[in-house]
Design a protein with these regions (language model features):
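N-terminal cap/lid segment of alpha/beta-hydrolase-fold proteins
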Residues: 25-63
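Alpha/beta-hydrolase
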Residues: 72, 107-109, 189, 260
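Primarily recognizes the serine-hydrolase "nucleophile elbow" in alpha/beta-hydrolase
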Residues: 142-210
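Alpha/beta-hydrolase active-site loop
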Residues: 124-153
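C-terminal catalytic histidine-bearing segment of alpha/beta-hydrolase fold enzymes
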Residues: 251-299
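The conserved beta1-alpha1 loop
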Residues: 72-74, 229
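Short substrate-entry loop that stabilizes the transition state in hydrolases
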Residues: 64-66, 75-114, 237
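The feature captures the conserved acid-bearing segment of alpha/beta-hydrolase catalytic domains
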Residues: 185, 191-250
Length: 299
């Protein structure tokens, strides 16, 4: 009887310990185009080959090929907040870019919202914060999404731009070592990691480590960076942001730092609002170096 029980348990144990059979991950469009701006759900590669990152793609009218703008969203070390994060859209910024002939991709990175999966860009606690590793992890995710879209016939193979916000901007700084023919410019809105340490305004987790990481990114930088921060940013205030930008520049990075007027009650989120995009519009337009925008419907 004992032998019979063993014979029954062996295949059962094998089933319980076998690796799961995963459905094949597919990339590309996952829904119809809609409003505004031909809004469409897409799936793009992530560092986890079993997980596709959810993304939104917006396009101007016509067949293209269009220059591509990839918007890299902010993040948080709080796992619950990440899990509850809605799909980022950056509507006002997207409208600004669409009006100037860009296709716009907004991917949601691993460990956030509907994409889910493991949070690969975790920086660690204040005592052991690794801002270089976390920034490079974010850069890898941005790069995977960008390269996947560049395979599409309606996207140009050159002159893409990356616009990063907060942690997304930090990843964009790490991506400044990419081919400048593929990515012509980076715009970073209040880039950084570790802001609002313990949810306290104007407190940064391991600021000296963050400064050293900015210098590390600057060493290999090849793409010019426009660094924008609002006067009332309580995550990375202008004084500290200037120090970060200088660390990046002194080690070899090319950076144009601009302090913008206060926007709303918290300037760190300026780029998510129409007022913030308006405040930054001249600087963004200068980076894009484009003629006057085409007429588009308001989102």
């Amino acid at each position: 009887m004992r032998l019979l029980n063993i014979l029954v348990l062996v295949p059962l144990l094998a089933l319980l310990t076998a690796p799961p059979v995963c459905a094949q991950v597919t990339f590309g469009s996952s829904g119809a185009e809609g409003d505004p701006f031909r809004r469409q759900q897409w799936r793009v590669p992530s560092p986890d080959t079993d997980t596709a990152a959810h993304a939104l793609l917006f396009r101007p009218p016509g067949a293209g090929p269009f220059r591509l703008a990839v918007i890299a969203h902010a993040s948080t070390q709080n796992g619950l907040r990440r899990a509850q994060m809605p799909q980022p859209e950056y509507r006002a910024l997207t409208a600004f870019l669409i009006a100037r002939g860009f296709a716009v991709l907004v991917p949601e990175r691993l460990g956030h919202g509907a994409t889910g999966g493991r949070y690969v860009e975790d920086q660690g606690g204040c005592d052991e914060a690794d801002y270089v590793r976390s920034g490079r992890a974010t850069a890898d995710e941005i790069s995977l999404a960008l390269e996947d879209l560049r395979k599409q016939d309606f996207i140009r193979k050159d002159a893409a731009i990356v616009i990063g916000h907060s942690a997304g901007g930090w990843g964009a700084l790490a991506l400044a070592n990419a081919d400048p023919k593929a990515i012509s410019a980076i715009i970073a809105f209040a880039p950084g990691r570790g802001g609002h340490a313990n949810d306290e305004s104007n407190r940064i987790c391991a600021p000296h480590t963050l400064l050293a990481a900015a210098a590390e990114f600057g060493k290999a930088a090849r793409i010019p960076v426009t660094w924008l921060v609002a006067a009332n940013d309580s995550y990375f205030a202008p004084a500290f942001s200037i120090a970060l930008a200088e660390a990046f520049r002194r080690s070899g990075g090319k950076v144009d730092f601009r302090a913008l007027p206060a926007v709303g009650s918290e300037g760190h989120w300026m780029i998510e609002s129409e007022a913030g995009v308006k405040a930054a519009s001249a600087d963004i337009a200068r980076v894009l170096n484009l003629p006057k925008p085409m007429a588009t419907k308001k989102p």
